[in-house]
Swiss-Prot record:
Belongs to the class-II aminoacyl-tRNA synthetase family. Phe-tRNA synthetase alpha subunit type 1 subfamily. It comes from Bifidobacterium longum (strain NCC 2705). One of its GO terms (molecular function) is ATP binding. It comes from the Bacteria. It is found in: Cytoplasm. This is Phenylalanine--tRNA ligase alpha subunit. Its cofactor is Mg(2+).
Length: 355
C-alpha cells in the first residue's frame, strides 16, 4: 500500500529551518550536497509536503502552496551563496596544493591519453559493424513523440514527469521524417532513435545507436545527469528471442572475454514484449566471478512497429540497451562517476594511448 502523504506545515517549516542552519555550518561541498539531498531531495520532508498539497481541501491549497514556495526560496537563498563560497574555497585550496616551482628545469612534454569512455564506445561500434549492422545517431533534442509515445509509453507514465525528464522551451519542431512534435525533450534514452530509424531506413533494419542521454539525476559516485547508452535494434522477418540471446552472448564475449556469458530474467519495459533484464557473468568481476545486472532487452512491442507503419504480423524485432559508463566501470578499476566527468588529466594518463 502506498504511503499516505500528510501536509504538516509546522514539521516542514522546522525541517527547512534545520536544513538552512546546517547549510550555514557546512565546511565542504560534499557535506553541502548531502544536506541538499536530505532536506530537498526526493525523500525529503519538503518534497513530500509538496506532493501532499494535492490531497488538501481546495481552500487550503493556496496557502500551502505559498508556504512551500517561500520555504524553497529560503532554502535556495541559503544554498546558492554557500555553494559559491565553498567552491571558491576548494579552488583556492587546490591551487595552493598544486603550486609549481618556476625555477625548476622544464620537464619533457608528457604523452596524452584518450579518455576511456569514447574508446569503449568505439569498441562497441566496431563490434556491431563487424556483424554488418549500421551505426545510427538520433538528435539529443528530441520530439516527445519519438522519446515516449512511439515507444508505447502511456501519457501518464512516470518517466514523462519533469522530475525525470528535461523539457525544452519551444515546440512544433519538424524533423526529417515529417513528424511535428507537440513537445520537445532532451532525450532520456537512445531508444528514441528506434522509430525514427524505422521510418527513414525501412526494413529489414539492424542498427546500433550509441550516444548521450540526459536524466535529472544528481552527480554522485554511481549516477550522472549526462551519461551514455548504446541501444541495438533488429527488425526483420522471423526474428526470435534466440537471435537476441545470440547477439548478447557475442557482445559479452567481445567486451569481457571468452568466458563471459549472459542470462535473461523476466521484466517489463513499455517498448518490448516480452521484456527481460540482462545479467552478465565474467571471471574478472570485482569481488570474484558472479552475476550482475548489465542492461535491458526484449522483443520489440508490436505497438512500436505499428508506430513506424510496420506490420507486426510480418516483421518481428528485438532490442537491447546497455549503459556505457556501467560497462566501463565493470571492465576497469574505476569506482566513481566523478572520475569520468571531471576532466582531470591525471585520470586519463592511467590509460595507454591507442589501447
Amino acid at each position: 500500500m502506498a504511503e499516505q502523504m500528510v501536509f504538516d506545515a509546522d514539521q516542514v517549516t522546522a525541517e527547512v529551518a534545520e536544513g538552512i542552519e546546517k547549510i550555514q555550518n557546512a565546511s565542504n561541498l560534499e557535506e553541502l550536497k548531502a544536506i541538499k539531498t536530505t532536506y530537498a531531495g526526493a525523500d525529503s520532508a519538503m518534497t513530500k509536503a509538496s506532493k501532499a498539497i494535492g490531497s488538501l481541501p481546495a481552500d487550503q491549497k493556496k496557502e500551502a502552496g505559498k508556504l512551500m514556495g517561500k520555504l524553497r526560496a529560503d532554502f535556495g537563498r541559503a544554498y546558492g551563496p554557500k555553494e559559491v563560497e565553498l567552491k571558491e574555497a576548494a579552488e583556492k585550496a587546490a591551487l595552493a596544493a598544486e603550486t609549481v616551482d618556476m625555477t625548476l628545469p622544464v620537464s619533457r612534454k608528457p604523452l596524452g591519453a584518450r579518455h576511456p569512455l569514447p574508446k569503449l564506445m568505439e569498441d562497441v561500434e566496431d563490434f556491431f559493424i563487424s556483424m554488418g549492422w549500421q551505426i545510427s545517431s538520433g538528435p539529443e533534442i528530441e520530439a516527445e513523440w519519438y522519446n515516449f509515445d512511439s515507444l508505447n509509453f502511456g501519457p501518464d507514465h512516470p518517466a514523462r514527469q519533469m522530475q525525470d525528464t528535461f523539457y525544452v522551451k519551444g515546440n512544433q519542431a519538424k524533423d526529417a521524417a515529417g513528424f511535428v512534435g507537440s513537445n520537445m525533450v532532451v532525450r532520456t534514452q537512445t531508444s528514441s532513435d528506434q522509430v525514427r530509424a524505422l521510418l527513414t531506413r525501412g526494413v529489414p533494419l539492424y542498427i546500433a545507436s550509441p550516444g548521450r542521454v540526459f536524466r535529472t539525476d544528481e552527480l554522485d559516485a554511481t549516477h550522472t545527469p549526462v551519461f551514455h547508452q548504446c541501444e541495438a535494434l533488429a527488425v526483420d522477418k522471423h526474428l526470435t528471442m534466440a537471435d537476441l540471446k545470440g547477439v548478447l552472448d557475442k557482445l559479452a564475449v567481445a567486451m569481457f572475454g571468452p568466458e563471459a556469458k549472459t542470462r535473461l530474467r523476466p521484466s517489463y519495459f513499455p517498448f518490448t514484449e516480452p521484456s527481460a533484464e540482462l545479467d552478465l557473468w565474467f571471471p574478472d568481476k570485482k569481488g570474484g566471478p558472479g552475476w550482475l545486472e548489465w542492461g535491458g532487452c526484449g522483443m520489440v512491442n508490436p505497438n512500436v512497429l505499428k508506430s513506424a507503419g510496420i506490420d507486426p504480423d510480418v516483421y518481428t524485432g528485438f532490442a537491447f540497451g546497455v549503459g556505457m559508463e556501467r560497462t566501463l566501470l565493470l571492465r576497469s578499476d574505476i569506482n566513481d562517476m566523478h572520475d569520468l566527468v571531471e576532466g582531470d588529466v591525471r585520470f586519463a594518463e592511467q590509460f595507454v594511448m591507442g589501447e
